[in-house]
């Protein structure tokens, strides 16, 4: 076998100019450390409480890494608890997908999966206690009336005419709500706090609403369901959560979180902490809008590689490590800001640069016949699977007929062109130097074949008396594997896709070139055995992953994970 000592890696991109802070910060670490040092807590328990009404997205990844990462760092536990209080929008499909995503990211929750619905009986009993204490009442206002009575940020609200119902009447009405006597929306149970509070969340918030809907966990047992604010703090208390960590939009909810804990006989009183959510440009993370993209078939499902969902990133070829590293890189703080998508791409490039085997795949094949190479002869070349890591060697047959990329030959090249041109020379990666002698064209003038000659003295060394600057990738014609390649790009053209012009929709920002499907591509023989989720660097093309759904050994389908360089800067 011939081994090419001059085979060199494709030049790698430099770190993205916005690669994040040199020292990532997490303001929660010293808080947790102080709580342990003071003896306030002997063990840290955090939780990740998604609502099962959609797939997890990249913003959830930050929350997962914060909660699971902190607990792991300090020897604690993290609970996975589904906030399943809105059965009309929830589905077992989402529950299964969320559990798979958490595991895929590399985290394990403590004990069994938990559900807020497990605590419905206790939450109901606590609601009755608030009624008995004169701190909750059944309200008959319509939603429109309730909005009017609530006031505004600059004007106080006013008390509902039903606010002073007797305890006995409220107990009776709440029991009848539970028994299913009333239609959806006819009545709600409210906490009696302060309609003049400057914090809108304390203006008699809803505790329970009527919803005749089948629940995926409790069936038809309930037709009244607690809202998130009444569920989340008490669930934390039941589970002994020490640090209830959420995003900054819940900061104004913390007084209500504490009010419930102060006014109910809960077993412990967790503390809520808030951090800034992940705002990633060129991305949408609204579950409602992500669902709209799926339902209206702008994308091919929740796991479409252009989606910001974790299952989408996984299918595109992102690794769990790259996403964890990205979340660590951007830090955890309380300052809202927008993170450049290039930082996420830098993270996956950095990971795959070290871990992805190299291979060659010709996306737009152009047949090359090497006229002076002996007919019937096949030479076995050896190329390294990786330029630095010890991943072994791969065998590549070389013979008279090969494919190169159509873009690597130009009859009238621009200045500085270093690929193949008439009477010009290039080196085939890991192989010989060839010269373009003749271009064969069809009746329409399209080039269908190149006739070239090779220099047999150039395997592993430069030719005598001349310098060859260009290097192109290639595959053998007979032994190469036909494959499909999907070139994915950012789904949105705008850095802020939700900011549409007047009368426009975020859908108007969809990038029409976000997916290009290439068929008839030719890959080196080793890629024919690729398993779903196998990742590679296609030399000179980018990083690719065998599709988790559609790729099969012998019939590979590859998704472009990321280009070799940031093409958006």
Curated annotation (Swiss-Prot):
GO terms for molecular function: ATP binding; glutamine-tRNA ligase activity. ATP binds at residues 51-53, 57-63, 247, 277-278. SUPFAM superfamilies: Nucleotidylyl transferase (SSF52374), Ribosomal protein L25-like (SSF50715). A motif ('HIGH' region) lies at residues 50-60. Disulfide bonds: none annotated. It catalyses: tRNA(Gln) + L-glutamine + ATP = L-glutaminyl-tRNA(Gln) + AMP + diphosphate. Its main location: cytoplasm. It is found in: Cytoplasm. GO terms for biological process: glutaminyl-tRNA aminoacylation; glutamyl-tRNA aminoacylation. It is an enzyme of class 6 (ligase). L-glutamine binds at residues 83, 228. Its EC number is 6.1.1.18. It comes from the Bacteria. GO terms for cellular component: cytosol. Residues 1-23 are annotated as: Disordered. A motif ('KMSKS' region) lies at residues 284-288. Keywords: Aminoacyl-tRNA synthetase, ATP-binding, Cytoplasm, Ligase, Nucleotide-binding, Protein biosynthesis. Monomer. Belongs to the class-I aminoacyl-tRNA synthetase family. This is Glutamine--tRNA ligase. It comes from Pseudomonas syringae pv. tomato (strain ATCC BAA-871 / DC3000). The gene is glnS.
